[in-house]
Amino acid sequence: MFNVVLVAPEIPPNTGNVIRLCANTGAHLHLIEPLGFPLDDARMRRAGLDYHEYAQMRVHRDWDAFVAAETPDPARMFAFTTRGSGRFHDHAFLSGDWFVFGSETRGLPAELLERFPNEQRVRLPMRPDNRSLNLSNTVAVVVFEAWRQAGFEGGA
């Protein structure tokens, strides 16, 4: 299945929504510290309802600890960013891919984004005068498109 990586998320309900999404799609969730809230935050738990127990989630102290623990294939990692040049609809996603998202207010740090080749810095299409999409909405669009490409493997 797919892997969702949130780097330093700040808004508890967004993370709660992503937990619920991962529970319902089978995607694995990785949270990279620092987090902008405690994991027992009531707003996050409310947004995730009772799906926390069904989601596969791991917390990593920083990016390097994440890479060491998970050993993701760099060729199958995609950084989603408003500064991306790769076109979302040009990618053929595969089960096991890693989708990396930055925080709600800052996005991915430049030093992290630079580790991704240009074609793996992906931007979702949107109206030209708008800043960005909501983090949890963006994650949902990406995961469902990837899952669709995989034939909704494991879905009912």
From Swiss-Prot:
Pfam families associated with the record: SpoU_methylase
Keywords, sorted A to Z: Cytoplasm, Methyltransferase, S-adenosyl-L-methionine, Transferase, tRNA processing
Domain of life: Bacteria
Enzyme class: transferase
Disulfide bonds listed in the record: none
Enzyme Commission designation: 2.1.1.207
Chief location category: cytoplasm
NCBIfam families in alphabetical order: tRNA_yibK_trmL
Protein name stated in the entry: tRNA (cytidine(34)-2'-O)-methyltransferase
